Amino acid sequence: MDNVDKTMKSEISEEDPEQLFRVLEVIGQGSFGVVCTCINTVNNEVVAIKFLEMEGEENSSLKKEITILKNTVRCPYIVKYHGCYIKENNLMIVMEYCDGGSILDIMQMCSITLTEAQIAAILYQIVEGLVYLHSNKILHRDIKAGNVLVNKLGQAKLADFGVSAILVNTGFKQKTVVGSPYWMSPEVISPPKGSNGYDSKADIWSLGITAIEMAESKPPLFNLNPVKVIFVIPFRQAPTLEVPGNWSPEFNDFISVCLNKEADKRPSAVDLLNHPFIKKGKEHSQPTISEMVEQCIPTMKEYRRKKAEEEEAEEAEEGDDYDDVNGGGDERQHGSSVSSAGLQKGTLLKINTITQRATVMREDGTEDTSNNGGTFIYNNNNNNSSKTSSSGTVVFSKNGSIIKNDDDDDDDIEEGGFDSGSVVFKGSTLVEKFESMKLKYNKRRQQQESSDEEDEEDEDDEDDEEGGFDSGSVVYTKSPVNQDD
């Protein structure tokens, strides 16, 4: 625990996780690490474990995430926290496993459009979760379909508190620009004159965007590069459903009240419980979600099986030699896993504040849905102590927050265990399996980056917005919106 500060050590169990858990299958992976389903060998309970590398002393966000999870264990609308362990410099956060995966998984793996009844049922439970969070002075700050997990019991649960905030008091407001670009509220990006920040109403805006995302399988403006989106959101009219007539007046009104550009005129989560659309969703919420999950699981299982077979076939062709995967002569930015050369203007990096490594999130002119937009952090405070970026730097950051990989996400459990589509690990211990998956992920990531660089054309398009980005930059050092005007 050498890299863990004293305050965080108190949160970590002294038990050996190798003796408690056995890895079953990978359900998510990214530059942050790996999320696996594991079985508790004591009580045979299946849990989800987030594996994170502990490097340096950047533990504040993890400490906050764990604190929030601990403080919300009694809420049925928030993913339950089971404990925290460290093994060989790897942090393991143990949480309940939701067998239906995320709402994003269901939409993408099953290629379905949710019905209005399903959307209402899900939104009701999300609102209940927000009521609990906001009453306890917690802002989620990253509400979206990818962060809502569901299970066969018909429960919808908020997850991923890596960028959440705990307010000091009821009147306290936040100033850090954080969240996923397409779901961010106008006041988070560009606080109105005279405003000292934003509060829980920012989550209500994200909820409205999530409602549209569930109805249309993508959030508004998803055709735009995320850099451009942060310039557009504060100055455009509030989004609506593309074809309002296809939906009920109650649903249209729900979106309208959530997406009021004046934050103080948006309803609170408590207010939304009395909205006709949410009251309609409450009536049959759990049966509706349960039926949806049961219907989708076979399709999702087949999707994952095929993906696992494809990956195994690719590995068989390439061989297991990983000696040269991180080689090459390109200069790397401090700790970066991507080259600073060859990236187009407008390229975004996601920065892992735990490992201080960067990977390409989305390049200019592309539309990559696999990362679901990423998570954006911009610190307006002058006392920023982050070691990965100086105050005033705009980055797309992991900060402990999971960016879902659509192709590798939440797998279902069959009676007696997992199906034959499970990922095959090298090594036998938890840590060895974690290291094995990191190698696989980094190998695929580097192959994708190499392919992207080969196909890259020297194009210059619309991302050079007012406010000015340095041509060829990969990390931007200006506020997303000029707030001094």
Swiss-Prot record:
Could you say which enzyme class this protein belongs to?
transferase
The keyword Metal-binding appears for this protein: yes
Where are the stretches annotated Disordered?
A: 304-343, 360-424, 436-485
Detail which positions bind ATP. 27-35, 50
Keyword annotations of the record: ATP-binding, Kinase, Magnesium, Metal-binding, Nucleotide-binding, Serine/threonine-protein kinase, Transferase
Q: Which InterPro entries match?
A: Kinase-like_dom_sf (IPR011009), Prot_kinase_dom (IPR000719), Protein_kinase_ATP_BS (IPR017441), Ser/Thr_kinase_AS (IPR008271), STE20/SPS1-PAK (IPR050629)
Reaction(s) this enzyme catalyzes, per UniProt: L-seryl-[protein] + ATP = O-phospho-L-seryl-[protein] + ADP + H(+); L-threonyl-[protein] + ATP = O-phospho-L-threonyl-[protein] + ADP + H(+)
Output the SUPFAM superfamilies linked to this UniProt entry: Protein kinase-like (PK-like) (SSF56112)
Q: Which family does it belong to?
A: Belongs to the protein kinase superfamily. STE Ser/Thr protein kinase family. STE20 subfamily.
Q: Which GO terms describe its biological process?
A: intracellular signal transduction; negative regulation of canonical Wnt signaling pathway; positive regulation of apoptotic process; programmed cell death; protein phosphorylation; regulation of MAPK cascade; signal transduction
**EC number(s) given by UniProt:** 2.7.11.1
Name a GO CC annotation attached to this entry.
Answer: nucleus
Q: What is the protein's species of origin?
A: Dictyostelium discoideum (Social amoeba)
GO terms (molecular function) for this protein are: ATP binding; metal ion binding; protein serine kinase activity; protein serine/threonine kinase activity
- UniProt lists compositionally biased (Acidic residues) regions at 310-324, 406-417, 450-468
CDD domains to which the protein is assigned, alphabetical: STKc_MST1_2
Q: Give every Protein kinase domain span.
A: 21-278
Which residues catalyse the reaction?
142 (proton acceptor)
Q: Enumerate composition-biased segments (Polar residues).
A: 474-485
Spell out the SMART domains in the cross-references: S_TKc
Please identify the protein, giving its name as recorded. Serine/threonine-protein kinase dst4
Named cofactor requirement(s)? Mg(2+)
Bias (Low complexity) ranges: 370-393
